[in-house]
């Protein structure tokens, strides 16, 4: 069971050995079916500004300083993941979640890193409307409903 970054390393190494050297690596996971061309182009533009590793991110409504908790296994008590004196969500630092719209990196960044976080990564903010990451059945059903609704709108425009 390899993690995604290890799979990228393997794919890049295999491609170099079997196809030849190349400059850039991009991953567009199928778990982000709501991605748009413009969101991918936005990542490419940021990558083109001499950023060797770019990933898409979106603002999250969850925050380790305010509403993410850890539950004790013995007594079910809860505590903040990152204890703080913040009492209002508006005062909490802005937090982003990586979303699989696009991952773009120089080939050597993938090969040389020991793990995903071993070096600088630039986050490109994308809208939460397209940031669905299908991890479970509910995510799938949500994405399916959005796509069906978009298709119905397109059909109305054609008629």
Predicted regions and their residues:
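Short amphipathic alpha-helix with an adjacent loop that forms part of the alpha/beta core around
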Residues: 9-17
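Short acidic donor-binding loop at the edge of a beta-strand
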Residues: 16-26
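Helix-loop-strand module that forms the ligand-binding subsite of alpha/beta enzymes
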Residues: 30
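Hydrophobic helical membrane-anchoring modules
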Residues: 123-125, 129-159
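Conserved core of the sugar-phosphate nucleotidyltransferase
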Residues: 1-10, 24, 33-126
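Active-site catalytic microenvironments for nucleophilic, acid-base chemistry
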Residues: 14, 46, 146-149
């Amino acid at each position: 069971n390899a993690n995604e970054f290890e799979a990228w390393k393997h794919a890049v190494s295999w491609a170099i050995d079997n196809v030849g050297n190349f400059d850039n690596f991009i991953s567009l996971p199928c778990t982000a079916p709501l991605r748009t061309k413009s969101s991918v182009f936005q990542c490419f533009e940021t990558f083109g500004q001499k950023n060797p590793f770019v990933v898409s991110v979106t603002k999250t409504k969850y925050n380790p300083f305010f509403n993410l908790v850890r539950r004790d296994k013995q007594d079910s008590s809860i505590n903040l993941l990152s204890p703080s004196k913040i009492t209002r969500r508006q005062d909490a630092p802005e937090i982003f979640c990586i979303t699989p719209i696009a991952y773009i990196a120089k080939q050597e960044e993938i090969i040389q890193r020991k793990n995903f976080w071993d070096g600088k990564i630039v986050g490109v903010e994308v809208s939460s409307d397209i940031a669905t990451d299908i991890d479970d059945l509910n995510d799938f059903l949500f994405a399916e409903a959005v796509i069906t609704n978009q298709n119905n709108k397109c059909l109305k425009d054609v008629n």
